From Swiss-Prot:
The gene is glmM. The modification Phosphoserine is found at residue 99. This is Phosphoglucosamine mutase. Its EC number is 5.4.2.10. Belongs to the phosphohexose mutase family. It comes from Marinomonas sp. (strain MWYL1). Transmembrane segments: none annotated. Catalyzes the conversion of glucosamine-6-phosphate to glucosamine-1-phosphate. One of its GO terms (biological process) is UDP-N-acetylglucosamine biosynthetic process. The keyword Magnesium applies. It is an enzyme of class 5 (isomerase).
Amino acid sequence: MRKYFGTDGIRGKVGTTPITPEFMLKLGWAAGQVFKENDKKILIGKDTRISGYMFESALESGIVAAGADVRLVGPMPTPAIAYLTRTFRASAGIVISASHNPYTDNGIKFFSAEGGKISDELEERIEYFLEQPMEVVESSQIGRAKRIDDAAGRYIEYCKGTFPIGLQLSGLKIVVDCADGATYHVAPRVFSELGAEVISIGVNPDGLNINEFSGATKPELLRKNVLAEEADLGIALDGDGDRLILVDRHGVVRDGDDILYIIANHLMRTGRFSGGVVGTLMSNFGLELAFSETGIGFSRAAVGDRYVNEKLMQHGWVLGGEPSGHIVCRSITTTGDGIIAALQVLRAMVEEGKALDELLVGLVKFPQKLKNIRVAKRFVPNEEPTLQKAIAVANERLNGLGRVLLRASGTEPLIRVMVEGRDNDTVDELVEYLVEEVNSVVSAKADT
């Protein structure tokens, strides 16, 4: 049983265990112990939140104290660290980020030498060393740290290289929202160097404003800019660049389900698709129906890009993602990458000569409503008898024409309640009913 690692690394509020300088020092040392056995080089990147600089120094100190070398790349998107870990032949990559969360949170995510998430076994080995006394190697064996100055340029060229040489984005006006996060100095350049007219927002990070007013979780500012600029497309990335949400020319926000539909169908129409698509338990039932009508296989994974990746590898498929905007194109990259996913959508638009909304004809989504309930004590909803009964009641009401999902968040102290069906009123009623039932369980647990 892992003590610190959750479904997406280690995450929490800055200054609260384990997101403290003391813990990061020890974590760096523990990681150094694990990864120096293969190669002494560990890559460290971060997003733009102010605490990242503090934790970068702590991790660096711990790693070199264990006798491993460090390569520092500064603020870079999470998928860029996955790519750079591979190209620098590092034994591991570390990202300091809390993704779409506010600046008051931070976290740590590890990548393997191949650019994928590290295994549960490696996480357990790191946790083993976290419980051991920290011992510094002899002075002659202390690791060395170097800063990589051309990391951004390397990643920009990699992203551009995934777009066909014969295609240009000339004539397209695109608003790019970087959430004042890690993509602020790379995403606008990728799209402009491919020929697009780019209007950039969310590109002035100050350490405190990451994800605050814009980005993939707050697309309203992007929507307003797309309409005001009469742009062809709006691209919203989250703070670490692994999520993508789009806004079409009419100001309609398009999520990860829409993106999967566009990419999969374009691959199918151009003869480059095989296998199926992996979604999650949160993927809209309408997406599943649309794929079945076009002969595209569909499989659901647990929520989290880690589980999407695992399911893709199980099936031998290459495309998967989540409604939240994590899109994995395994034929191109090893992890969710917002810029790469946006380029795949743009390729479909250019090659088919269609606007974003025109590429979505054929996808009819079921009404879906999601509510989050903050809890003091985490619990598994499906193991509670009261909630088991409530789920059964809701499913009976839907009569096979919808879905009910209650689950605990893997990264925050939340219980998520989701209902989808063909009728908005029924969906609203059932969500309120289930929220009331969850709150009764939460209250009962608070009294014990």
